[in-house]
Swiss-Prot record:
It is a single-pass membrane protein. One of its GO terms (cellular component) is outer membrane-bounded periplasmic space. This is Probable CtpA-like serine protease. The active site is at residues 324, 335, 349. The lineage of its organism: Bacteria, Bacillati, Bacillota, Bacilli, Bacillales. It is an enzyme of class 3 (hydrolase). Residues 9-22 have a biased composition (Polar residues). It comes from Staphylococcus saprophyticus subsp. saprophyticus (strain ATCC 15305 / DSM 20229 / NCIMB 8711 / NCTC 7292 / S-41).
């Protein structure tokens, strides 16, 4: 038997195929034809994106006369080519090409078809521990885009940023390739390296990343003075339970102000986003709305809000890497004035996909609805604007300098300005931020190289670039000026 899984996509999803007679595995939030299914966490060993998935079951058996006529023609073309083409043909490849053509005709970057082999690879990626680079990716239009790098992951340490566009893997173009195939290229054994060519700000950069074992922690709690900070990395199984337990503990410790840090949280299970909102939002209040055509259904909180959570002043911290289930949760909290939202605008993903699995193990995913906040805000392509904007430091938005580029005295290039800004932030004083590689920059580089046990030559080469990028990332993580600014407001 084939399976069907209805899924909501707040970033990107992977869906499963179905034959006309399929058994459904789903999570019912209420008794109706609206069903929510767990979103698939596509952790590409570079990690793809995690997205909550929702769907409406509107499947009827059989085809109408027009549909039968069209399918008969497709069958005739398939049979003719398979039997009579002058070269040997593959029945499987012809069938796959026909399906790919139908999906491509939708002109929808979030609808896709995966073969059995691709599906197997996808299923292997759905776990909390995996070997990869720790970056979540999605297909946006004809581009492969980074949704967000995971905190402390090899990708983040190498300088990968949200909305970076991946154009090549190991020097080979990935144009036109399905997301799952690209994921396979990025994957590999622990300790091996992969080079991604990314575009950011109109410039292309090669970034080499060492694959490592990635463990996805769901909730981390730290006390900062009188404020409890809960870093929520992903919405996975038991995230809501982990957060509720941590809040109870914080309440016992006397904490009455909390920050829910959703920065670079790409999403995850919609079910967990709803349950997490239910910690703060009372029973029978709408958490998210599902809409398809004229059909609209509200998914509501099923329990009373936590008494400890009710006793707390809540702030939510987001950025452009906050997507999918993060936005479902933030949108609900914002609509009910349960929290003030700080940071920068979120990613913006508000459409829903359904997944279908066929008997041969292949998968089909297609968009079938959208989701809205309790007050009917549609955030797709727009994101959620924070109540109070807190800008990230300029150096955190610097373009990564390609690892295959070398610069020396006398060069004039935009990347030279990046070096000057970055070195200045790292404590190597430079008076100007021009694009000219001058003697002042050369002296600063020599000091940097000497301090970091590199060859002291004043040239910006690959080894210098790697250490330069690593230290900027470490500085951003250590200082966290955005969080510190928020804590000053709250303490």
């Amino acid at each position: 038997m084939s399976e069907s899984k209805d899924t909501t996509e707040v970033n990107q999803e992977v869906n499963e195929k179905a034959s006309s007679q399929s058994t459904k595995k789903q999570i019912n939030f209420k008794r109706s034809h609206f069903i929510i299914i767990l979103i698939v966490t596509i952790l590409v060993t570079a990690m793809i994106a995690v997205f909550a998935t929702i769907g409406i079951s509107h499947w009827t058996s059989g085809l109408n006369s027009d549909q039968r006529d069209e399918m008969k023609k497709v069958e005739q073309v398939y049979q003719t080519l398979d039997d009579e083409y002058y070269k040997d043909t593959s029945s499987e490849e012809l069938g796959t090409a026909a399906i790919d053509g139908m999906v491509k005709k939708l002109d929808d970057p979030y609808s896709d078809y995966m073969t059995k082999k691709e599906t197997k690879s996808f299923n292997e990626d759905v776990s909390g521990d995996f070997v990869g680079i720790g970056a979540e990716m999605q297909k946006k239009g004809n581009q492969i885009q980074i949704t967000s790098p995971m905190k402390q992951s090899p990708a983040e340490k190498a300088g990968i940023q949200p909305k970076d566009v991946v154009t090549k893997v190991n020097g080979k173009s990935i144009k036109g390739q399905p997301l799952e195939a690209i994921v396979k290229k990025v994957r590999g054994k622990q300790g091996t390296k992969v080079t991604l060519t990314i575009e950011r700000g109109g410039q292309a950069h090669d970034i080499t990343i060492k694959r490592d074992k990635i463990h996805v922690k769901s909730v981390e709690y730290q006390k900062h003075g009188d404020v409890g900070v809960f870093t929520i990395n992903k919405f996975q199984n038991s995230t809501s339970g982990e957060l509720k337990s941590a809040i109870i503990k914080a309440h016992k410790d006397g904490i009455r102000k909390i920050v829910l840090d959703l920065r670079n949280n790409p999403g995850g299970l919609l079910d967990e986003a709803v349950k997490m909102a239910n910690i703060f939002i009372d029973k029978n209040e709408t958490v998210v709305q599902l809409e398809k055509g004229k059909h609209k259904e509200a998914i509501k909180a099923s329990n009373d809000a936590s008494k400890e959570a009710k006793d707390m002043d809540v702030s939510i911290l987001v950025n452009k890497g906050s997507a999918s289930a993060s936005e479902v949760f933030t949108g609900a909290m914002k609509d009910y004035n349960k929290a003030k939202v700080y940071g920068s605008k979120t990613f913006g993903k508000g459409i829903v996909q359904t997944t279908r699995e066929f008997e041969d193990g292949s998968l089909l995913k297609f968009t079938n609805m959208k989701w809205l906040t309790p007050k009917s805000h549609y955030i797709h392509g727009k994101g959620i604007t924070p109540d109070k904007k807190i800008e990230e430091p300029a150096y955190q938005s610097l373009n990564v300098i390609p690892s295959n580029k070398t610069y020396q005295l006398g060069d004039d290039d935009k990347n030279v300005k990046t070096m000057k800004v970055g070195l200045n932030v790292l404590g190597y004083h430079i008076n100007n931020h021009s694009t000219e590689f001058d003697s002042e920059l050369e002296d600063a580089l020599k000091s940097f190289q000497k301090k970091n046990n590199l060859d002291v030559n004043g040239t910006f080469n690959k080894s210098t670039n790697e250490k330069f990028t690593q230290q900027l990332v470490e500085k951003a993580n250590k200082e966290d000026t955005v969080l510190n600014e928020l804590l000053k407001k709250l303490n």
